[in-house]
Amino acid sequence: MKNPYAIGKNIYLRTPTIEDAEGEWYQWFSDRETTKFLGDRYLPNSIDQQINFLKYAQEAKDRIVLSICKIENDKHIGTCGFSAINWFHKSADVSIVVGDKNHKQGPVTIEGMSLLLEIAFKRLGLVNLLSVHVASNPFTPLINKIFGFEEVGRIKNFALYEGEYMDSIISQLARKEWVARNQ
């Protein structure tokens, strides 16, 4: 393991590197299958853009980006983290993208989200997490249900998906509910 920040059973999370940005990471965010439910899926990505994002994220005070890596071989298979962090209100948006097609919609997403929630509520002292997804996304609601997120709002016709405007759904997980479920 290289500089682990959080360690699970099969994966660990660490700070992203230039090598990550120059590797497969930038390709994931040009891949239609990987990005079809992401808000910025319409624009192609490049190595230079990924490196610029990495540099921005490292300097940002309201964002934490982590690389998802396999413990067995240190392979970088995804990215996750927190954005729109409000240190005063102790809240953030949470996200996870498994880019490696051999690990999509499987245990990596569950284990990654579990590690993120532990980081948010135990290490960072956050009180509320938000998860936002387009209504046509079938995967995020399943993950949210597993971890106890509750739908708290809906923005009508907000996100363009496949030529149609869809609702954006906002779900919340409060620290006290997470603690009650994980005692």
Question: Where is each model-derived feature located?
Answer:
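Juxtamembrane/interface motifs at transmembrane-helix termini
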Residues: 43-47, 56-59, 98-99
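An amphipathic alpha-helix signature
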Residues: 18-26, 47, 51, 55
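Acyl-donor (CoA/ACP) binding surface of acyl/acetyltransferases
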Residues: 1-21, 31, 65, 69-183
